[in-house]
A protein has these predicted regions:
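Short amphipathic alpha-helix with an adjacent loop that forms part of the alpha/beta core around
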Residues: 197-208
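N-terminal Rossmann-like NAD(P) cofactor-binding module of classical short-chain dehydrogenase/reductase
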Residues: 89, 145, 191, 213-214
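Glycine-rich beta-strand-centered segment in the early N-terminal region that forms part
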Residues: 25-43, 51-94
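NAD(P)H dinucleotide-binding glycine-rich loop of Rossmann-like/cofactor-binding domains
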Residues: 66-73, 83-148, 293
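Mid-domain Rossmann-like dinucleotide-binding core that forms the NAD(H)/NADP(H) cofactor-binding site
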Residues: 119-196
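A generic alpha-to-beta junction signature in SAM-dependent methyltransferases
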Residues: 138, 206, 229-230
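Glycine-rich phosphate-binding loop and adjacent beta-alpha segment
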Residues: 182, 220-294, 327-337
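C-terminal capping/lid region of NAD(P)-dependent oxidoreductase domains
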Residues: 1-4, 293-300, 308-337
Length: 337
């Protein structure tokens, strides 16, 4: 079987050459483990942060098989709770097959399409939902700004905020992305950070200030937004993609100044902080989807061999919506054909 290892840790920008595709023997599960066939791999900016040091998981170092969340099919189980043929989400790897401790897999409902298990009903949608409502405490009267608005999480943050009546302004890279989030996803406006004076344009779009900022990029974008925050505004710190590949990361120069004078609340989180509330979120988002208030946006790359390219593209802002890689055919679609 094929798998990718991190061949060499990147100094700054990640390149396809940092990975190596290997041919290895099919692994065998032991008691308490399952062997899965990976179908879809989740491609996330967090994949890059795992290479920089220990976070909420061990650091990925040279020689490690590249980890990833996945949707997978159980091929062999050494745990009575799981059976061959079941579809699961898993803390898996960039590989055709993976052996995983059963505590790191979850059974999936059979009425949700597999890509949706990684997008709206997976890491992306759940991160958007819990960040917006549980951390940011969004309410209908809020003016909400979200950076990386065309990215995996941002596309859902904006739509969820619009669904409860918020004014939503996105920040994205390029005129095409900005037009898409406004015309296809219903944002009230979007600022192209590549061709903008952010402070000026945020004032134009949000003349009365910003109640809630969902930050996916950090750096100078966060710096500009803090200037336009209302007193007692909330900043949801979800990611810092602008800093992940910088040899000298740029931090906002107005912290703690504006945080103090504006009495701002900045809070970071990871999606698993709210694991016990996932079903509540999925139920709510299913209702919004059925009501036509959310559009699912997915960016699927075909083939395990293209996983490094998909991650590099994401880090360079080339994806629109939730990025993932299809490793194997969908068994549901095969049964229907």
């Amino acid at each position: 079987m094929k798998q990718f290892i991190l061949k060499e840790a990147p100094d700054a920008k990640l390149n396809i050459s940092n990975f190596e595709l290997q041919e290895v023997d099919l692994p065998k599960p032991e008691d308490g483990q399952v062997l899965v066939r990976n179908i879809l791999l989740s491609i996330d900016a967090a994949n890059r942060t795992w290479m920089q040091g220990r976070t909420y998981r061990d650091q990925v170092v040279a020689g490690d098989v590249m980890p990833s969340y996945s949707v997978a099919e159980i091929v062999e189980s050494k745990d009575p709770e799981f059976k061959k043929g079941q579809i699961v989400t898993a803390d898996s790897f960039w590989a055709e097959y993976s052996v995983i401790e059963s505590r790191y897999i979850n059974k999936c409902p059979d009425n949700i399409s597999l890509p949706n298990l990684l997008s709206l009903f997976g890491i992306a949608g759940l991160t958007a939902y819990h960040g917006l409502f549980d951390v940011g405490e969004a309410k209908a009267s809020d003016t909400v700004v979200v950076s990386a608005a065309a990215g995996s999480v941002g596309v859902y943050v904006g739509q969820l905020a619009k669904a409860i009546g918020c004014k939503v302004v996105g920040i994205a890279g390029g005129d095409t992305k900005c037009k898409k989030v406004v015309e296809e996803l219903g944002f009230d406006g979007c600022i192209d950070y590549k061709n903008a004076n952010l402070v000026r344009d945020l004032k134009t779009h949000c003349p009365e200030g910003i109640d809630l900022y969902f930050d996916n990029v950090g750096g100078t974008v966060l710096e500009a937004v803090l200037i336009r925050m209302k007193n007692r505004g909330r900043v949801v710190c979800c990611g810092a993609v602008s800093q992940y590949e910088s040899s000298s990361p740029i931090g906002p120069r107005n912290i703690p100044g504006f945080v103090i004078t504006k009495r701002l609340k900045l809070e970071g989180f990871i999606v698993m902080d709210f694991k016990e509330k996932h079903m509540e979120a999925i139920t709510h988002m299913t209702k919004l989807l059925n009501e036509g208030k959310i559009t699912i946006v997915e960016d699927i790359t075909e083939g395990l061999q293209n996983a490094p390219k998909a991650l590099v593209n994401l880090l360079n802002g080339k994806n629109f919506g939730k990025s993932m890689v299809r490793v194997a055919p969908d068994p549901y679609e095969q049964k229907m054909s």
